[in-house]
Amino acid sequence: MGSSSRVGDENSLLDLTEKVAVVTGANSGIGLYILFHVARAGAKVYLGARTEAKFNSAITRLKTEGLDTSKVVWLPFDLSDPRKAKESAKWLLERENRLDILINNAAKILGPYAQTSDGLSDSMVINHMSPYLFTKTLLPLLESTARQPGSDVRIVNVSSVAHRWVPNPRYDSLEAFNNNFADTWKPKTNLYGYTKLANVLWTKELQRSFDRANIPILAMTVHPGNVMSEGNVKLFTSLMFGTIINWVFSLFFISPFDGGYTPAFAAASRVIAEDRRKYAGAYIVPFGVIEEASEDARREDLAKDLLATTDAVLKQYDYA
C-alpha cells in the first residue's frame, strides 16, 4: 500500500462526543493523525506537545486537513524527565473529571544512545519510564471514568515491530535499563526495540492488573505499520542516493494518516466495543488486526522484572 493511500472510515469509530482523550506526541507525524481520527469522532482531545508553538503549528496542519479543532486543547508535555511527565498528569487531573482514552504515542526513535542528567538511558526514560509514570498518575481518573455507566475506557501504548528484534532482553536492574547495545550488530535498532518491548510487557501486565481488580479498562499495544513519517523521510534523505531511497520506500510504506488509524482503531473502534475481552491486552497491527506479540513479550517473568525495576528506579531518583 503506497504512502498516498487513505484508510480509516470515520464511521468505523464510536461516537466520542462528550468523551475526553489524550494523545501524546501529537504535534507531528503519526501522532498528529492519531489525534485527527479521534477528534473527528467527536472527542475533546488533549494534544500533548512540549511547547505552545508546536501545538499551534499542529492546529494549523489539522485545519488544513479539514478538522474542526475547537475541541483540541494543548497539554504541556515533556517526557525527558519523569517529574515533568507527572506534572503534566497532575495538570490534567486539575482540569478534567473524566478520561476515556489515553494514547501514549510520544517516543524517541532511532537516535544515538544518550543519558539524562541523572545518568539514565534517555531512550528508556522517554519511551518507558515517563509514559509509565504519566499513566500511573492518571489511573485514578481512568478508573473512576470506567465505573461510570456507558463508559468504554481504553489505554493504547504505541509500540513497534522492533520489539521482536531484541537479543536476550533483561529488565532486572538499572544496569539492564542502561544497556546501550554497543556490542550488537545494530545498537540503535536494538535499543529502540528494547524500549518498545518494554511497552508491550508493561501493557500486558497492566491489563492483568485490571482483570484481577475487576476494573473494566482495556489496555492494548499497537504497531502502527511501516510509516513514511517525517523522521523516516529525514533519515532516508540523509543517506547516499536518499531521493531514490525515499521514492522506493514510499511505494511500500504507508502514510502518516494511515499510520494514525490503527492506534485510533484501538482507542475507539466499534469492533472492539462489541468484543472487549478479545482485545484485552492485545497487540494490534494495521489495520485493526490482532497479532501475537513476540515470545519475549509474552513472558510474565520479564514483565514483573520490568515493573519492579521501574518502580525501584522511580523511587531511587525521587520521581514517583
Curated annotation (Swiss-Prot):
TM stretches of this protein: 19-39, 235-255
Its function, per the record, reads: Short-chain dehydrogenase/reductase, part of the gene cluster that mediates the biosynthesis of melleolides, a range of antifungal and phytotoxic polyketide derivatives composed of an orsellinic acid (OA) moiety esterified to various sesquiterpene alcohols. The first step in melleolides biosynthesis is performed by the delta(6)-protoilludene synthase PRO1 which catalyzes the cyclization of farnesyl diphosphate to protoilludene.
* Active-site residues, as the UniProt record annotates them: 159 (proton donor), 192 (proton acceptor), 196 (lowers pka of active site tyr)
Q: What else is known?
A: Armillaria species are both devastating forest pathogens and some of the largest and oldest terrestrial organisms on Earth. They forage for hosts and achieve immense colony sizes via rhizomorphs, root-like multicellular structures of clonal dispersal. One genetic Armillaria gallica individual localized in Michigan's Upper Peninsula stands out as exceptionally large, covering hundreds of tree root systems over approximately 75 hectares of the forest floor. Based on observed growth rates of the fungus, the minimum age of this large individual can be estimated as 2500 years.
Q: Which pathway does this polypeptide act in?
A: Secondary metabolite biosynthesis
Family membership: Belongs to the short-chain dehydrogenases/reductases (SDR) family.
Top-level taxon in the UniProt lineage: Eukaryota
Keywords, in A-Z order: Glycoprotein, Membrane, NADP, Oxidoreductase, Transmembrane, Transmembrane helix
Query: What protein does this entry describe?
Result: Short-chain dehydrogenase/reductase ARMGADRAFT_1169971
In this protein, the residues bearing a glycan are 157
> Any one cellular component term from GO for this entry?
membrane
Keyword hit for Transmembrane: yes
Topologically, how does it sit relative to the membrane?
Answer: Multi-pass membrane protein
Enzyme Commission no? 1.1.1.-
> Which class of enzymes does this protein belong to?
oxidoreductase
GO MF, one annotated term: oxidoreductase activity
Q: How is it used?
A: Melleolide sesquiterpene aryl esters are cytotoxic secondary products with anti-cancer potential. Armillaridin shows therapeutic and radiosensitizing effects on human esophageal cancer cells. Armillaridin induces autophagy-associated cell death in human chronic myelogenous leukemia as well as of hepatocellular carcinoma cells. Armillaridin can also inhibit the differentiation and activation of human macrophages and thus might have potential to be developed as a biological response modifier for inflammatory diseases.
Q: Where does NADP(+) bind?
A: 30, 78, 105, 136, 192, 196, 227, 229
Is the Transmembrane helix keyword given for this protein? Answer: yes
Q: What is its main location?
A: membrane
Q: Where in the cell is it found?
A: Membrane
Instruction: Give the species.
Output: Armillaria gallica (Bulbous honey fungus)
